[in-house]
């Protein structure tokens, strides 16, 4: 099935609801991107909470609006905490999102992520290599870097979405968002987004937060991808390199006006 182009008008409408709700987003993410992820959520209008201790994380998951599990710096003890927290979110019917960082390259995290799938994530966000590995269609990849084009992983993403009954996002030069039946494409962004650490992990947090919104989950998640692409483009236009891109990107998220972007593109 051919993907449809995501509508920016819908993304503008969704962003208004997102900012009004300010979803409380519980992030169990990796140590490298904690600050950038929290700042990304804040800049867009969400409320991040970086609660990781298992004593606190399990009960907190039941009161948050959404949960992100990112396995970038996974350890055995952290895996236990994540599993217990996901169980709490699942029991409380809180949507949770999986970011299976480097799932194809390392066996421990691959087995852990596959085990978590039984707890029905609302969304999965990964690059092409990660989605191919999680679906069982391929192993490998170079950690957080992808060795595959996003489009090559689309059949795997669609099959995984149908199997788990969730939204799957494959990110790349063009992002693809699918529920297994319908697929949306989101072009845009800028190569500078790949020259800093954390844009993909931060996107996963925004995807998680968007899953707390009412309405069609596919459209909400695609809108989240659209916001990040638009902010990346805007930031790159006033950046000289990776160092100046990060603050420009956060500013672009904070000032993001999708309707104005529609008028100029």
From Swiss-Prot:
This is Hydroxyethylthiazole kinase. Its EC number is 2.7.1.50. It comes from Salmonella paratyphi B (strain ATCC BAA-1250 / SPB7). Substrate binds at residues 50, 198. It is an enzyme of class 2 (transferase). It comes from the Bacteria. GO terms for biological process: thiamine biosynthetic process; thiamine diphosphate biosynthetic process. Pathway: Cofactor biosynthesis; thiamine diphosphate biosynthesis; 4-methyl-5-(2-phosphoethyl)-thiazole from 5-(2-hydroxyethyl)-4-methylthiazole: step 1/1. The keyword Nucleotide-binding applies. Pfam families: HK. It catalyses: 5-(2-hydroxyethyl)-4-methylthiazole + ATP = 4-methyl-5-(2-phosphooxyethyl)-thiazole + ADP + H(+).
